[in-house]
């Protein structure tokens, strides 16, 4: 059984959605409302101590971090592999994934965060926004 803890506006969640769709896997979705700070719920922090989304739970075991989730899913369900068999090509795929995680995601995180939370935060007192 697969349960995916998500937030739909999360770029990382979208990456996992695409991987699960490519593998044609069904899963239960559990929405984590970041606006309500549900990512800090003690039960969720047991699954993902960083309190970020997404997190995949498979047979009671939690896998955090979108790139790790995608690799896990590809290894667990090897039909239609997404990761190449060739060691060199696999290293190139991981290099690209690392680039996305460490550079492109970091560059877009502030913009996507600002777009998502702008309306919510502009009505907050300044001390709460900090």
Summary of predicted features, one role per range:
Residues 1-129:
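GST-like domain detector, emphasizing the conserved glutathione-binding G-site
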């Amino acid at each position: 059984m697969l349960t995916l803890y998500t937030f739909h506006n999360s770029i990382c969640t979208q990456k996992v959605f695409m991987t699960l769709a490519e593998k044609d896997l069904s899963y239960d979705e559990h929405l984590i409302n970041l606006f309500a700070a549900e990512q800090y719920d003690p039960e969720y922090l047991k699954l993902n101590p960083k309190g970020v989304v997404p997190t995949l739970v498979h047979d009671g075991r939690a896998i955090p971090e979108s790139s790790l989730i995608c690799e896990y899913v590809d290894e667990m369900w090897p039909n239609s592999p997404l990761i190449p068999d060739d060691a060199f090509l696999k290293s190139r795929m991981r290099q690209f994934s690392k680039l996305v995680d460490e550079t492109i995601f970091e560059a877009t995180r502030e913009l996507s965060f600002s777009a998502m939370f702008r309306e919510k935060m502009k009505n907050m007192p300044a001390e709460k926004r900090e």
